[in-house]
Amino acid sequence: MSYPLEEVNKRRTFAIISHPDAGKTTITEKVLLYGNAIQTAGSVKGKGSAAHAKSDWMEMEKQRGISITTSVMQFPYNDCLVNLLDTPGHEDFSEDTYRTLTAVDSCLMVIDSAKGVEERTIKLMEVTRLRDTPIITFMNKLDRDIRDPIELLDEVENVLKIRCAPITWPIGCGKLFKGVYHLAKDETYLYQSGQGSTIQAVRVVKGLNNPELDVAVGDDLAQQLREELELVQGASNEFEQDAFIKGELTPVFFGTALGNFGVDHFLDGLTQWAPKPQSRQADTRTVESAEEKFSGFVFKIQANMDPKHRDRVAFMRVVSGKYEKGMKLKHVRIGKDVVISDALTFMAGDRAHAEEAYAGDIIGLHNHGTIQIGDTFTQGETLKFTGIPNFAPELFRRIRLKDPLKQKQLLKGLVQLSEEGAVQVFRPLLNNDLIVGAVGVLQFDVVVSRLKTEYNVEAIYENVNVATARWVECADEKKFEEFKRKNEQNLALDGGDNLTYIAPTMVNLNLAQERYPDVVFYKTREH
């Protein structure tokens, strides 16, 4: 058989989710260090460049070119090939972040142990729930003063509604941080500060009651560890592979990414427990990752901000089969066959032309405006993958033209940008406003600058009285007509002409939902 299943089975595709400042960039960097993808940590651009605010944002994009190198990184670890998908944090936050989570088989959740569960983490976890994605948890920043570890586990369980199974347990924190104890292996790994940029051998003490442990961490901390572990082992969950795969239980690791400690523990967990590339639901059937014929779907489109190169790169997750350079694929939505000879792969940060890729891998397709989010490519079969959602935006602005004669170009530009997933556009039924919706502020700046460079339309955005939006449907035609008649001032069409309810306040939305129980208000919609 020409299709090597061992290639598929050794792949692990995951994303990191966290609140800004929980240490995601540092972890990404340390993970690449362990995967031998970079030689010394400190080469992933992180906070140092955070001073680039909005004003020099275009310049920043030019420096980054397509910030594609940090979007997907592939590296070997243990006997696996790991694909790490970056989910932009901070101001880059957009629907892309959400959609990236639909293209992975597991996630690493990073929590700042001094702060606990934060708002962005909660939002991202909601998205992983759409597909019950398995979650591994890393409690970061133990080299600082942290909250009580038992309290942290309780918070994850109560707020994120997922059971915790601690795999390692911290000994002290802040200046007194001495290391972690591995519950399953009955070993203590001792921490040495100042080892952040390279990988050093760690001293291991075997056995919890080994007198060597008391010498290494001090009598008080050793005693405290034994007492805490009695409590923890009595009260917490054992790790169960089955519950983990269903997204009901998360293994928890403690460490400090900055001090390069504990990162290898969760990587071992990831390669050992995280699922290999999974099957995926399409409209007509389920596609298994072991199938020989190629199939894949586009989950993200990255625009290049360099006006000289209007290339955009469509990120495609390979679901089944093998991509080979120069192969002919069917672009199902438009029914055309295309030869793909210059797909990109992402080996450890280099943008290289792909010779081959297997299920679980991510490849980049050059897109000159024909590819949309959610598009499926196959080796001839007509099917469409489902589960690539649009999310109800949380921020809204009205877009206004400086030159009113360019209304047509503006609409064309906005619809194309919405197909690409850069922003969502809404046209109210009762006026000629154009309202754009996003989940991150930066998206508005992107839209205005791209309208100018790509469509030659000068536009500005201004505040608009919209708090939230929901897609609406109703099985009862008569009731739906009445709803539409009475709520016309709150209705709009989105970029794909789907009817949307635009609410000025959350109270208004809640009242509408109570008043019209037969109308369904959706927070997400299929692409």
Curated annotation (Swiss-Prot):
Q: What is this protein called?
A: Peptide chain release factor 3
Q: What is the lineage of its organism?
A: Bacteria, Pseudomonadati, Pseudomonadota, Gammaproteobacteria, Pasteurellales
Instruction: Name the Pfam families for this protein.
Output: EF-G_D2, GTP_EFTU, RF3_C
- NCBIfam families registered for this protein in UniProt: prfC (TIGR00503), PRK00741.1 (NF001964), small_GTP (TIGR00231)
Q: Which Gene3D superfamilies match?
A: P-loop containing nucleotide triphosphate hydrolases, Peptide chain release factor 3, domain III
Q: What is one term from the GO cellular component aspect held by the record?
A: cytosol
What GO annotations for molecular function exist for this entry? GTP binding; GTPase activity; guanosine tetraphosphate binding; translation release factor activity, codon nonspecific; translation release factor activity, codon specific
Indicate whether Protein biosynthesis appears among the record's keywords: yes
